[in-house]
Amino acid sequence: MKYFGLDIESHDPLLTDQGPSWVYSQGEVLVTGIYDAQKQKKRALNGAGGDTVHDILFSSATTIVGANIGYDLGWLCYAHKLKIKDTRCGLIDVAIAESLIDEYQPFSLDALAQKYLRERKGSEDLAGIALQYGLKGDFRKHLKALWYGETPDKVSYKDEIRAYVISDADQPVRIWEKQHPILEEQGLMDAFIMNMKMVRITQAMKQHGVRIDYEKWQENCAIASAAYKDLHEDFVSKYGEVNINSPKQVAALFDKFEVPYKHKLVFKGWAPEGRKFSANDWLKGDEVWDQRKRLKESFPNIRVVKNKIVLMVPKQYAARTALQASSMGYQITNNPSVGKFAFAAVKATHQVAADIVEFKQVTNIITKFLGPNFGRFLVQDTVGDWRLHGNFDTVGARQTGRMSASKPNLQNIPSKTKLFEGTEKELDLAFMCREVFVADRGQMFVKLDFSGQENVLQAHFAVGAGGRLIRSMYMANPRLDEHQFVGERSGLIEQHGPKAGRKYAKSVRFGNAYGMQLQTMCEQFGWDKDFAEELTNAINDAAPWVRETMDAIQDMLLGKNAYRGKQRRYIKTIIGRRIHLREGNDRGAYKFYNYLIQGSASDMMKLALIKYAESDIANIVTLLLTVHDEGGFSVPITPQGFAAVLILQTFFCSAVELSIPINADPEVGHSWASAEGQHKTDGAFDETVQELLERVGHELLAGNAAKTTSTDDDEDEIDFDALGDEDDTEEEGEDE
């Protein structure tokens, strides 16, 4: 295997606002740096590197090494007019490797060069040149001007840029030589290989994009805008003009309507010379120190949150204090705390809070998805279709490694948000957002996700007698409704009814899984303390495996009666990814049960998508998007397409080997929103997946045919068998 360090420098004018400019056919690759590790030869090639880089990308005997390699791969394939999924070279990204070794450290090339090579990234010269011309901000934004001599004195700095790109190609190879043994020693290579395969998959998904029904989107934007206007007018008529994003204005409104809320005191200190300090300067473990004095001695509840020293105290607490004459003075800012938990705690009992929550949700959805902000990400392709080419980060979440989306963040589309619910003006904004995401022309949208994934993983990892119990229940019934089971076992369904009892069971169990304390549950779900205690005790007694497993994980991390003799400060997900408990952060150990579940869920999704991408069905079915535990695919309405979905379903069900079975249920339709699953009667499916695919496929084909045939409804009956013929469908696709 030949290793090539690789880096590009590009003119990327849209990167900050809209993502890589190649998506919008703007910008260019200025220079490509290559370091041949075998020959120890460095080169800077103009543009995208010509045949040299083309041959490297298409050789299975080569591996390219870089930092943020997916970005470079996208630009190079755009410049060479290549499909990313067709490239054959291996990929190594030292930033992704570092995310596995130490998820708390910065992953930039400069930080990695300092850590492993004891040197800096070679950017000082170019940064200085940019400043010399008064070019503000990151000098990389001005590389085009420096490359082409678009400076006041018309001087080109190509040699300096070539030296810079060569350095960026060379350093990752030398960093990888240090990282590779660490990954091997810690058993992280499987996780690393998985994530590197996902780089190619996510970049290919970005390159293809997802088709957007532009007319439907414009229609929904107009409807949402009119609804927002009505909502805003109604809000102003009740409460006046209020900036709902201003804590002070919301607090004033709460005071007017006597809505309770907390205040948060923020301590800000000054060193003797008047310099404002950072909390990190005086942070020892989880204690805050002022010079040699531990502040906890004076303020028992003081703690550090996001690098700010804070103390939760009653509203009437004094607004200023001092420690002693020889010590620094501390100014205490009495800030209202009116975040999402504050609203959750009072929205059930105070209409003003409920109205603000609704207004914020609607504003957020419309701003991000049903207005111009979303429209700026859309691109019209060569056949006139509008497409979205979003960004997908393979390891977006530092602790768990879960994928993330940006520009736009599709994870911000809620599952359900209804406006004017129960009235004739009712709108489902979540549905309106999703229904504009459609399959490729002449195809159907198939959504596939894991059924009860988090519940299954909790059962898989569960310890003790409770763990054996829940696993036996899943073995007896692979489609166990665990929330229903726990609701019945706890007596909540008998006490509160089937719907409310199941909902309470689900809320408490997920609250436990996400590490919520009792007070947080009260605020999140609008419960009083006694009711929350009653629910929590009932659920913990009925489902002891969650608490038992959480306790076992914390004991292992903290060395308290270490479970099965194990004592270590990290947990491992299914693939072997390590999630570390930092020194001095013992209080955060309660979160690691959730990290274990979320990280393993991420592993499952990635491994399922890798099975898909490495199979022949990737030539039939196209991955359009992935959000949380679901993937959206474009599938031909043909027997081949139907068969491919059945195979895809097996990939999801067999992504990892669990101690209990897991199911993945496809939903099929015209769009992301309209995708529907198998019909059920009395809890059992009354059609197979094959029947579902054929039924919905025929309905979609009939709908398409109706748009292009005579408007006389009674004239001709549609021949479903003819419409479903594979040859006819292929011809139709070629014509389009």
Where do the PLM segments sit?
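Short amphipathic alpha-helices in soluble, non-transmembrane regions
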Residues: 644-652
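Conserved catalytic core of nucleic-acid polymerases
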Residues: 203, 207, 328-332, 336, ...
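Conserved "right-hand" nucleotidyltransferase catalytic core of DNA-directed polymerases
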Residues: 1-17, 21-33, 40, 117, ...
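Short active-site loop/helix that positions an aromatic residue
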Residues: 70-82, 99-101, 251-258, 451-466
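Long, low-complexity, intrinsically disordered segments
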Residues: 714-736
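A short acidic-Thr-Gly-centered motif at the start of a beta-strand
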Residues: 1-2, 55-58, 428-444, 614-617
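Active-site-proximal helix-loop-helix substrate-binding element of RNase H-like nuclease domains
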Residues: 24-180, 279, 478, 483-490, ...
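Helix N-cap motif at beta-to-alpha junctions
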Residues: 636-642
